[in-house]
Swiss-Prot record:
It is found in: Membrane. The keyword Membrane applies. It is a single-pass membrane protein. It comes from the Eukaryota. Keywords: Membrane, Transmembrane, Transmembrane helix. The chain crosses the membrane at residues 64-84. This is Uncharacterized protein C1F3.08c. GO terms for cellular component: membrane.
Length: 108
């Protein structure tokens, strides 16, 4: 499942209990990540142990590594581990803003 929302919608989610509830529900899944097609790329990876890296404190060089690392995993492992049929490229996002993706593994 992939969920998209613009930055204002995401900011609203971050400030509500709905987002916290979503994170509690998603801790059992493979990855929950926030990515952006804006010049400043931010990423929030959530792992099984629910360790969260604050998106305001991630350096750009690590952000780019994280983005490419997840794309590598999706390309190489998606046929076996991820029930994602199609990943929507960032440039197809009409809002040209933050993209919120939830990648859920059926193996969870």
């Amino acid at each position: 499942m992939v969920i998209y929302c613009n930055w204002l919608e995401l900011k609203g989610l971050l400030e509500t209990n709905d987002f916290l509830y979503l994170m509690r529900c998603c801790y059992m899944y493979d990855t929950v990540s926030l990515v952006s097609n804006a010049p400043n790329i931010y990423s929030i990876p959530f792992f099984y142990d629910r360790i969260c890296y604050d998106y305001k404190n991630i350096l750009l060089k690590y952000e780019l590594f994280i983005i490419y690392y997840y794309y590598y995993l999706l390309i190489c492992l998606s046929p076996h581990f991820f029930p994602i049929k199609r990943i929507r490229p960032f440039h197809e996002n009409p809002l040209h803003s933050f993209v919120y993706r939830i990648m859920i593994s059926s193996e969870a």
